[in-house]
Amino acid sequence: MKKNLFILCMIMFIAQSCCEKPILIGHRGSLLGVENTEEAFINGAKHFGYQGLECDVKTTLDGQCVCWHDDHLQRAGIEEVLIPEITLDSLLSLPLTQTRKDVTYTATICTVDRYLEICKEYNVFPVVELKWATGINNNDMTLFPSLYSLIEKHGLVEEAVILTSMRKSLEYIRTNCPQLQCLYLRQTVKDEDVQWCHDWKTNISIQHANINPELVNTCNELGVEGAAWTVNNDSTYQRLVDCGCACVTTDYLEVK
């Protein structure tokens, strides 16, 4: 049986001991490269040594899944282009440029297929965040089977984690693809959110400032595991260790 990496990284979330170091997940790959592109993903795994890599998913005009946060490409210096209105071939021809920490990077769009190939090659688990996209949203999941097929193609069904703020999408996945692990993305958390996660056998991803020992206890009582996002400084990291959080998403954190 394949090793379930995500369960291993989450198992200490509710623990009270602060001796264990949290597992790190590279946010949109890492800081080193245009976000959500091949260079950022490879650097997240190879340079930083993150155990997981997170990407965002959008769909093109011809129904292909690509890694990007928005419908537009403005954060990469391209105006008046919308991913849902362009084919994959046309999208791949566009040069993406982004300056991060005073370093300018160039890249092309990364397909989800290539992202999963990188995860497999570097033995990291994928955290696939579903943004509202054509065919993958609360009202329409007709393109999700093609995304699932990519995960299956790379032999990552047991390792992959699906992350989204869209409840109905998660309910669809839990109903139709119960072998996939899911994370409910939240900024703030109410008891009702944790109860919903318990009912749907779904875990939770929480903005780091809203994680505290009381919330950890609430999750513990209902058997819900969680993750923290997005942590980029040592003091926040240490506070989460003290809270008992074992899994955090980061752009560039390096923990010795």
What does each model-identified segment do?
Residues 4-14:
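Sec-dependent N-terminal signal peptides
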Residues 17-256:
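Phosphate-group recognition and catalysis centered on beta-loop-alpha active-site segments
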